[in-house]
Amino acid sequence: MSASSAARRPVEAMLGLSIREVSQALRDGKVSATELCRKCINQIQRTRYLNAYITIAEETAMEQAERADKRLRTGKTLGPLDGIPFSVKDNFCTENIKTTCASNMLKGYVPPFSATVVQKLLDQGAVLVGKTNLDEFAMGAGSTDGAFGPVRNPWSYAAPYREQSAEDPDSDWTITGGSSGGSAAAVASLSSFLALGSDTGGSTRNPGSLCGVVALKPSYGLLSRHGLIPLVNSMDVPGIMTRSVHDAATVLRILQGRDERDSTTVQAPNTPPSLPEHFDMRKICVGIPKEYHAPGLSEDTLAQWSRVADIFENAGARVKEVSLPHTPYSIVCYHVLCCCEVASNMARFDGLEYGHRSAVDSSTDAMYATTRHEGFNNVVRRRILSGNYFLLKSNYERYFVKAQQMRRLIAEDFKKVFSSGIDVLLTPTTLSDAARYADFITEDNRTRSAQEDVFTQPVNMAGLPAVTVPTALSQRGLPIGLQLIGQTLQDWKLLTIAHWMEKQLHFPMIRFHRDLNENEREQNRSIRERTHTVGS
């Protein structure tokens, strides 16, 4: 669809457009920023049952949209995102807007500053409509373990899935993946044109795949982590979620680059203004890692993996099987290193400076212990306990040091493959499409995370860029995504190939089976309020 034809459509239809299309419509005066913002806010309210948002920033969003309209009227726009509504995972600091990490520990916490990546979007005129739901402190792979309740996958309410189910939508719904499930649901449900997530072991790509949106994990150091509440400093990366690869590239160009407040950032490579529309695949070699044929890989996912590999080959690309021999050990290595850094990072939440503080005052030790017990859920406490165990003097060499050694071997595997002439690796993102919530919660968090992150976390340990692109719907009517992995700081090349791939696949736009009637909406609001009301 061209921008001009898109601009003639009603404002409601514009919620499903790309950033490029709706940005053109704003500049052409076919829609105002305030109209667009209001439509997004209304869509958030219509889809409250998804539980995608923790806080809706309606008042500040409308003020930002009004300022964008003034710039648009005078032709002094700030860039391609001016007037575009976006959302942010609730583990990024946002000035004067609550940042909770979906935890009782930070419930009600209002930061005095915004994260660098958030501020860069605001400086471009983007309109922040809300903070999205997640697993507590981003520890999880389903967006089911936060203090504000689980997030529901929008595709659970789309026609392809609902037409196969005779069950009540309120009981038969699927997870979004995690931990950035709220961000993925926001983009997929058309309440936001882009969303920020965080990616430590797949927390952006996993929900991106399960919710049918593009999810980019940039090279480590390309985007600033300043203001992202840390989980694992050596692996955390801000992630980008959009409905097209081109949109992800637009956002990446704005967010990338050095930040004096984050010493791990690097200078951004020179990139062209946009991705090429035509690309000669005969120059590209695509690697297929044999170790990613993992136990539990669904037939649907395997079929899509084979289909897309054939698409590359038929276009003239060389497709070659490669080996990453240490991949089978990566999930255990990741678990050890993750828990060790979690134990360190969570030590700052002591009830003294900010966040929850227990009423117990019999002693400092009692206050500290009770504060952390009340503030953290079982998942967080278990990871802290595991990390402290791995870091004991008697265990340090056996666990932490060996895991660091294995991490280097995993990174070396990738280096060897890329130095052999491979341009990108094509892999599954997840083992299967989204699980039903009722089935997902039968396993413990540790087991679920190991299953969901098996294809994604090696990339974080190697610091590489990766993007998941929606490919097709499964037989159940749910999205399946495939992952492309690139070389360090070759994010633009990765996105160029992903853009070409996306154009061959023609993934469908979400089509909701029906709007929930007023009674169902009221019922879901009641369920929501039994956890916590949006914005509370």
Curated annotation (Swiss-Prot):
Report one GO cellular component: mitochondrion
Q: Could you tell me the superkingdom of the organism this chain comes from? A: Eukaryota
Positions annotated as active site in the UniProt record: K89, S179, S203
EC number, as in UniProt: 6.3.5.7
Q: Does the keyword ATP-binding apply?
A: yes
- Spell out the subcellular localization from the entry: Mitochondrion
Q: Between which residues do disulfide bridges form?
A: none
Q: Name one GO molecular function term.
A: glutaminyl-tRNA synthase (glutamine-hydrolyzing) activity
| UniProt-listed HAMAP family | GatA
Similarity field: Belongs to the amidase family. GatA subfamily.
PANTHER family, per the entry: GLUTAMYL-TRNA(GLN) AMIDOTRANSFERASE SUBUNIT A, MITOCHONDRIAL (PTHR11895:SF7), TRANSAMIDASE (PTHR11895)
Q: What does the record note on quaternary structure? A: Subunit of the heterotrimeric GatCAB amidotransferase (AdT) complex, composed of A (qrsl1), B (gatb) and C (gatc) subunits.
> What is this protein called in UniProt?
Glutamyl-tRNA(Gln) amidotransferase subunit A, mitochondrial
Question: What lineage is this protein's organism placed in?
Answer: Eukaryota, Metazoa, Chordata, Craniata, Vertebrata
Gene it is expressed from: qrsl1
